[in-house]
């Protein structure tokens, strides 16, 4: 029965595996299958496409349209305009927990909709860049991990945003986890500022100046049992210990400083991160990383599940960081985001690098073509 329910969404999920062994995207598909199994007449889908590839989204769209045609009423919560235009007849906007309005999809412009979501006119989706790109900071040389990725190579420079993209399951997250020490490559080398380094765990990575913003902020980036300020300090607690005791006042003041820097909207930093919106929760994870002395930031799907205005705020933070000399690796499944924010783009498929592009002159079609290359056409990176 489980296999029957999951196969329309994905044929690559082993239903006998525990959920903990599935990727975030696969877990999302299982949740969708579970919801669809209940034969409900009203179905609420909360960000169901957040971790899905274009192909998986299309399959979900077809299932959703079939349910609609069968008389099921669907509330589809999303931040993606493509979801709305493909499926919805009406769109309702909430901002800061308040109802803003409801419109027929075919009677509202993008500009008006964005204005309703953001609360102001947003004239461009991606802020202007001001960073000067410098020397190579991090170089990945032919790293491999059996069952995950093979002979992956790329580099990222000071002041640069390197986009790492490809279909869900391409191995992007696993490569980033290997750079950060969560996984250990079987072969290959990692160089930081021209010197080969050994990264056996995340502590090694942080001490070397490499930080990771994980794909799943709820389970991997935040500790909801702790207040916001302790989440901010959690990656660098030693800096607040004086004479063997934790200086709570210094800890709180540093958190306030960092939260102001990233324009966090929080009434009380003693509240848990769960009290914040998705965009502000992501900012808490950013603040935690900024509390460390880093050279390289790995951002795994940094704008997943957040609205247009919050995305723009995250983009501004990224540009400010690169202007201050950080090197950023940005993993993203959203091709417009990759093209709008990255200086160079690395495309992965089935654990291999299948293309590298300068953003200027590159189109979504070129990235998608590389992502869908046949096995025999792949080239090792």
Region locations from a protein language model:
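Glycine-rich phosphate-binding loops of nucleotide-dependent enzymes
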Residues: 1-381
């Amino acid at each position: 029965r489980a296999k029957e329910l999951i196969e329309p969404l994905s044929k690559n999920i082993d239903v006998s595996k525990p959920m903990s062994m599935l990727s975030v995207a696969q877990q999302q598909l299982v949740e969708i299958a579970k919801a669809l199994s209940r034969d409900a007449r009203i179905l609420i889908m909360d960000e169901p496409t957040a971790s899905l590839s274009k192909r998986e989204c299309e399959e979900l769209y077809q299932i959703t349209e079939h349910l609609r045609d069968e008389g099921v009423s669907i509330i589809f919560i999303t931040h993606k305009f493509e979801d709305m235009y493909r499926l919805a007849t009406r769109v309702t906007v909430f901002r800061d927990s308040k109802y803003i309005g409801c419109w027929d999809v075919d009677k509202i412009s993008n500009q008006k909709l964005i204005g309703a979501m953001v609360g102001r006119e947003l004239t461009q989706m991606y802020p202007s860049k001001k960073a000067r790109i410098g020397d190579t900071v991090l170089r990945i040389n032919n790293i491999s991990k059996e069952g995950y990725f093979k002979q992956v190579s790329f580099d990222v420079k000071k002041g640069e945003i390197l986009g790492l993209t490809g279909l869900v399951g391409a191995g992007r997250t696993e490569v980033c986890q290997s750079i950060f020490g969560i996984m250990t490559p079987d072969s290959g080398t990692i160089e930081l500022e021209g010197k080969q380094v050994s990264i056996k765990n995340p502590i090694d990575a942080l001490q070397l100046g490499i930080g990771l913003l994980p794909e799943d902020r709820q389970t991997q980036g935040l500790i909801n049992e702790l207040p916001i300020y302790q989440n901010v300090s959690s990656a660098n607690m030693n800096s607040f210990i004086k004479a063997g005791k934790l200086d709570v006042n210094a800890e709180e003041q540093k958190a306030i400083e960092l939260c102001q820097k990233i324009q966090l909207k929080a009434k009380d930093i003693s509240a848990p991160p769960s009290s914040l919106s998705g965009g502000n929760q992501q900012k808490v994870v950013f603040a935690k990383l900024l509390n460390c002395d880093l050279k390289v930031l790995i951002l795994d799907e940094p704008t997943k599940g957040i609205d247009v205005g919050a995305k723009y705020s995250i983009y501004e933070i990224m540009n400010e960081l690169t202007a201050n000399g950080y090197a950023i690796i940005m993993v993203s499944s959203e091709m417009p985001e990759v093209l709008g924010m990255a200086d160079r783009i690395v495309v992965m498929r089935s654990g291999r690098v299948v293309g590298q592009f300068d953003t200027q002159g590159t189109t979504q079609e070129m990235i998608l073509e590389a992502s869908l290359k046949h096995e025999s056409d792949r080239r090792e990176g």
